[in-house]
Amino acid sequence: MRVTATGVSVTIDGTTILDDVSFTAADGRVTGLIGPNGSGKSTLLRCFYRIIRPQQGTVHIGEHDVWRVPARRAGQLRAVVAQDQELDNEYAVRDIVAMGRIPHQRLLERESTADRAIVDEALTRARIEWAEGRRFVTLSGGERQRVLLARALAQNAPVLLLDEPTNHLDIGAQLELLELIRELGLTTVAALHDLDHAMSYCDAVVLLHHGRVVAADDPVTVLTPQRLADVFGVRGATTTHPLTGQPHLVFAAPRSERELPR
């Protein structure tokens, strides 16, 4: 199911955060939202999961305007792994993952046999089934992210929205999580801070700067030396990763303005 933003503008306390933003994330592909801090990545994602309502423009999942459907239906359309989600640390892992079934249940409805099977599958797909009886507080950062991903998978939504999913994780946990997300095959839109992660794991990227779309295409096409200089103020180039053979970004800080591409 495609994800589309059309002419989205957001102003908060007199400051324009997003200015006429449009993009489309293709069905079954991983699309990265990239840009410097303050470029509007997280705000754009929050428009899709109904935290921030655009003053102008629309956001769609498939044919559904996410602000015109009931909250329960919105929860069936997209699952979210947000930054720094607060949870009661005393919850057991399985209980947290089972929360993903709430959009599919009526008020006060108990967990069904089908719900339990879906939770089992989500735990397995996120490779955290071994911890289902553990308390959330006892897990490492990478393990907690897998639990939150499993909860999202339990929603059985066609679209996955991720806001800085590798934040605060060590490098091994980062790579494991990104590999897992790629393997899921879901339509995924992820705000990413690490440009090399975007290069390696995204099918397409949307580059934001000062709340506007600078470019949207495959990572190699978007992350040119000129754009890296203009948007991020660094010297950069695409090379071939010596271990994977895939495109890989390398960076260097400019010693002077003259060293930036013109």
Positions of predicted regions on the chain:
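Conserved ABC transporter NBD signature motif
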Residues: 57-68
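ABC ATPase nucleotide-binding domains
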Residues: 225, 229-262
